[in-house]
Amino acid sequence: ADNVMSARLALVVLPTVAFVGRLFPNLTVQGLGDPNYAYSLLKQYKGEWEFDTNWKMIFGHPKKAGWIKAIQEAQQTVQKGLKLDCPILVMSSNKSFPETETWHEEYMTSDIVLDVQDIQKYGEKLGDKVTRDTIPNGIHDLILSQKPYRNDAYQTIFEWLKKQ
């Protein structure tokens, strides 16, 4: 029920924020987010990686109305179809999980940033030479997934490249 309400709310809020972004692109519309994605990556918490948290901040970055506008416009363009004339590999995790304030182990094996069904659905509309694949237990940044799933992502990429 929460996911359905969030989706309905997004249908109203995102276009409104995008419109505001035309007039006030630098207006902050969302402050810092939850740290769970960073926790799933960083070695000092639950992950395998070390990185500069000044560049990839633990709580994300403040979202500006102009940024939301640009993303919404880009997503609408992709959803209509791009007709790119080149081989394209669309990859995602095999599952999404909603990020909340509370830590869940599913964050380690799910995309908690984007809806993987949308990635696969709209990825097909990028062009006529699209190959789609899912990586079981991959995270949003597939190459930063836990080692076994990261290896699956690399194998998928290299096998696809050999066929090109």
Where are the regions a protein language model picked out?
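Short glycine-rich His-centered loop
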Residues: N3-S6, K95-E99
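A hydrolase-biased, glycine/serine/histidine/acidic-enriched motif that marks catalytic-domain neighborhoods
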Residues: D34, A70, Q164
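Active-site nucleophile elbow and catalytic-triad environment of alpha/beta-hydrolase enzymes
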Residues: F59-G81
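Conserved loop-alpha-helix segment in the C-terminal half of the alpha/beta-hydrolase fold
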Residues: F97-T134
